[in-house]
Curated annotation (Swiss-Prot):
Subcellular location, record wording: Cytoplasm
This protein's UniProt keywords: Cytoplasm, Glycosyltransferase, Purine salvage, Transferase
Pfam families assigned: Pribosyltran
Protein name: Adenine phosphoribosyltransferase
Catalytic activity: AMP + diphosphate = 5-phospho-alpha-D-ribose 1-diphosphate + adenine
Annotated pathway: Purine metabolism; AMP biosynthesis via salvage pathway; AMP from adenine: step 1/1
Length: 172
């Protein structure tokens, strides 16, 4: 299946010069959604990635991470922007092109030696995925790899990630 055909391009969003890759059209296709999740599962299995938990990054990582976790018989853990989780959290700060940002995870979400797979809809510069991996590693988890639907290859995001398996289904 041609997933690119199911991803809508929106020029100049959210600002001029940006080509936004809109996955809502993919999500709207039952066949496309099933193919996407099945493809992620197949690639994880072929690389022997068997997580205890799938970690989805806010917010579109939730859309693909939860069905992937279900199919892989794993738990799902959200990593969120600050102030979105109600219980005590662990936090990691990371650099953006113009400033800083941070991510949080519930303190009781993971335990040392949990095997985790990090999922998001898209990898661009890799900063968010890298920060998520650093946080989980600091908490004693074994990060097995990363899974993305879209990879913006020109931004070299995979270069900043740890030397682990990286799955991406569509490359721009």
């Amino acid at each position: 299946m041609d997933l690119k055909a199911l991803i809508r391009d929106i020029p100049d969003f959210p600002k001029p010069g940006i080509m936004f890759r809109d996955i809502t059209t993919l999500l709207n296709s039952p066949e496309g959604l099933r193919y996407t999740i099945d493809s992620l599962v197949e690639q994880c299995e072929s690389q022997e990635l068997v997580p205890d938990h799938v970690v989805g990054m806010e917010s579109r990582g939730f859309l693909f991470g939860m069905p992937l976790a279900y199919q892989m018989n794993a738990g799902f853990i959200p990593v969120r922007k600050p102030g979105k989780l109600p219980a005590p959290v662990h936090r990691v700060e990371y650099d953006l092109e113009y400033g800083k940002d941070s991510l949080e995870i519930h303190q009781d979400a993971v335990a040392p030696h949990h095997r985790v797979l990090i999922v998001d809809d898209l990898i661009a510069t890799g900063g968010t995925a890298k920060a998520t991996a650093e946080l989980l590693t600091k908490l004693g988890c074994e990060v097995l790899g990363f899974a993305f639907i879209i990879e913006l290859a020109a931004l070299n995001g995979r270069q900043c990630l740890p030397d682990l398996p990286i799955i991406s289904l569509v490359e721009y």
